[in-house]
């Protein structure tokens, strides 16, 4: 027997209602997940604690004043649910402290006799000052440079080179055509830093995996004396310039920030803070 027109209409109506319900349910789950992500990170680091880390980031003397906000940091972290959410409470706090310490060094405005000390001036800059080049790798066919664009360091992690292309693809923006967005949009800026932190780029592991104790050293790591800890993270970020050197001031600055932040978090730093005896990753 053929279905009546009223039955067909009812079936279509019910199907539409079901699709609408599923779409609404998905949207609510996404919103809840984002709220959970914000509350997860905010339970580790409150606005007050965040501000105590970065005592001078909004000083008029800092070019990035009022750019790096606590709200943007929390919102960016929702895109990376494992950040600050892996392992014990100590490991979680230590990871967040390590991340903020590394980005503080990359954006520091401090000096040895600075007010409140040299490690209270993180997030002072949002882009590299007087870069030596436009950081274009003309041989890279996968991530080709766009004419007239500079791929100098920008954002908390000072994203540079072809990382603009990779980060843009992962986060949904055109990093090669519009690298300036990293220093113009606070949310995108923090997202690029967290993307770098969470993403493995072989032969380098992710900074996240190292700091939460989930990384198992390879044979090459053992041969290069790359020990797991904050020093290996420095090696991942800038080992070619800073590791394997005696008492490097840049490495010490990173460690100084980490020690201060870990203390404010009430956790220890863990072992292997420097990379003096480590060979850089290839």
Region annotations inferred by a language model:
Residues 28-282:
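Folded extracytoplasmic luminal domains of secretory or organellar precursors
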Residues 6-27:
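Cleavable N-terminal signal peptides of Sec/SRP-targeted secreted and luminal proteins
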Residues 2-3:
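Context-dependent free N-terminus signature
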